[in-house]
Amino acid sequence: MSSEKEAALRRLDDSPTIFDKIIKKEIPSTVVYEDEKVLAFRDINPQAPTHILIIPKVKDGLTGLAKAEERHIEILGYLLYVAKVVAKQEGLEDGYRVVINDGPSGCQSVYHIHVHLLGGRQMNWPPG
């Protein structure tokens, strides 16, 4: 089993995450967008010249995409809309990639749903 998957398996519960601390401003982050529903900030380990994480401010049991329920439809759509807004703000007119890693095999590292916005270079396919 890969070390990434082992690390993910240790964090499967709904306990507070580093993102909760970022939302509460208990630890620093480079915020690029914020409103009453979401927070977007630069990834501390970027995988592209532009790598931004977009998270809902209220987790509401939405630790990952597999946990989504009908009540989460609005926030899931809003996360994608904000990805578009931030991409434009970041000057990614030529294109960008939006990623949601889900679960241990999907290499999800923080169990608070989040969207990765990647751009600023040519994205390759397949991704991984």
Swiss-Prot record:
Pfam families reported in the protein's UniProt record: HIT
Molecular-function GO term, any one: adenylylsulfatase activity
PROSITE patterns listed in its UniProt record: HIT_1, HIT_2
GO cellular component: cytoplasm
SUPFAM superfamilies given in the database record: HIT-like
InterPro entries assigned: Histidine_triad_CS, Histidine_triad_HIT, HIT-like, HIT-like_sf
Matching PANTHER family: HISTIDINE TRIAD HIT PROTEIN (PTHR23089)
Protein name (record): 14 kDa zinc-binding protein
Organism: Zea mays (Maize)
Encoding gene (name): ZBP14
